[in-house]
A protein has these predicted regions:
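N-terminal export leaders
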Residues: 3-7
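Active-site SXXK
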Residues: 67-91, 116, 232
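Mid-domain, small-residue-enriched loop/turn segments at the edges of structured enzyme/sensor domains
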Residues: 105, 109-113, 125-179
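Beta-lactamase-like hydrolase cores
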Residues: 20-69
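Bacterial N-terminal signal peptides
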Residues: 9-16
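Structured C-terminal helix/loop/strand segments within mature extracytoplasmic catalytic/sensor domains
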Residues: 23-33, 38, 130-133, 178-265
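Flexible glycine/proline-enriched surface loops and loop-helix/loop-strand junctions
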Residues: 59-65, 108-110, 118-125, 152-158, ...
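Short, well-structured active-site flanking segments
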Residues: 83-99, 184-189
């Protein structure tokens, strides 16, 4: 790592730590039971901002500070980059399929932003990366202090490249997005939050995005209640690959229910 990359990484770490330090931090070693029940190794950070409170809970704080490839969770900021650069106009713009057959059937058709986010359509974001180029991608990453802000040579760089981010840094990013505090147009931030909706109840909305690098699985987002949001960032090891992926939501949902941040199933 060169001196400039080191300084950027240090700045990103300090930014995330500062954001977390601004709220009371409580370690929840007891949440190990949720990971044991799922036979999983990982960390979770919960930011509870309901009813005027602002407290952060963390299971395995050492791992929460460790950086991993963001995988498809990077589609959240990447979509903002594409909107800001004018590559993407809105959620309705049709992104024409390139005709290349891929193993996931829903990828083999025209896409729009909502569809591509929901189905993690990799080729759409590879096209965004091609059109943005490494220089602009790096500038955007530095602008929002996203992880180590390093694109690297692997493709896609958010899975195979050098870009990494910690659970703590993901939490900082999500809080800023929720509050429209990122350096992008407010309407673009609102649009991204809209396409992140996974499900909703009578008085709550769950906005989230999964990610998987092949070795580590993520689930990040928040639950909105009338009294305020509850943010969550989970990552786990996935030695059983596809077989481990459902554990991301299983563990997170069970922990959220334990603090009444999601209703019973």
């Amino acid at each position: 790592m060169n001196r400039r990359s080191f300084l950027l990484a240090a700045l990103s770490f300090v930014t995330a730590c500062g954001a977390l330090a601004a709220t009371p931090l409580q370690e929840r070693a007891d949440w190990a039971s949720f990971f044991r029940a799922a036979d999983a190794q990982g960390t979770i950070v919960i930011g509870d901002s309901r009813a005027g409170n602002d407290v952060t809970f963390v299971y395995d704080p050492e791992r929460a500070a460790r950086r991993y490839s963001p995988a498809s969770t990077f589609k959240i900021p990447h979509s903002l980059f594409a909107l800001d650069a004018g590559i993407l106009r809105d959620e309705f713009q049709v992104i024409a399929w390139d005709g290349v057959k891929r193993p996931i059937e829903v990828w083999n058709e025209d896409q729009n932003l909502r569809f591509a986010m929901r189905h993690s359509t990799v080729w759409v974001y590879e096209e965004f990366a091609r059109r943005l180029g490494n220089v602009r991608e790096t500038a955007y990453l530095r602008k929002i202090a996203y992880g180590n802000a390093v694109v690297g040579r692997g493709k896609p760089f958010w899975v195979e490249g050098d870009l990494t981010i910690s659970a703590n840094e993901q939490m900082s990013f999500l809080r800023r997005l929720y509050r429209n505090e990122l350096p992008f147009r407010v309407e673009h931030q609102r649009l991204i939050k809209d396409v992140m909706v996974n499900e909703a109840g009578k008085d709550w909305i769950l906005r989230a995005k999964t990610g998987w690098s092949g070795k580590v699985g993520w689930w990040v987002g928040w639950v909105e209640w009338p009294t305020g949001p509850v943010f969550f960032v989970l990552n786990i090891d996935t030695p059983n690959r596809l077989g481990d992926l459902p554990k991301r939501q299983e563990i997170t949902r069970n922990i959220l229910r334990s603090i009444k941040a999601l209703p019973p199933p």
